[in-house]
Design a protein with these regions (language model features):
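Amphipathic alpha-helical binding modules
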Residues: 69-92
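Long, non-catalytic architectural segments outside compact domain cores
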Residues: 1-63, 85-92
Length: 92
């Protein structure tokens, strides 16, 4: 098989995200943060797999709106940008 199709040199194992149990009331808030962190790290696929939600999930909108307000208050422009992108995607 051609080396072009072999990924033996890929680094490390899959990302691990710490989340509460799915039936925990704080799961959705934690999932929103994980999705934003995954996007920031260029690994949305792993974050989506870990949470069961896609980036822009409308159900997470209230949590992301809170994160956006926190980011604006803290002057965290990158998190603000990601939260705004999440909210735009969910509005489609």
């Amino acid at each position: 098989m051609s080396r072009a199709f072999v990924n033996e040199d890929a680094g490390g194992e899959a990302r691990r995200f710490v989340l509460p149990r799915r039936d925990d009331p704080s799961f959705d808030a934690a999932a929103a943060r994980v999705l934003l962190r995954g996007a920031d790290e260029g690994d949305s696929a792993s974050a989506e797999a870990a949470t069961g939600y896609v980036f822009g999930e409308p159900k997470l909108r209230p949590h992301v709106e809170r994160i956006l307000a926190e980011a604006q208050a803290a002057g965290d422009e990158r998190l603000e940008q990601l939260a705004e992108r999440f909210l735009r995607r969910g509005a489609r």
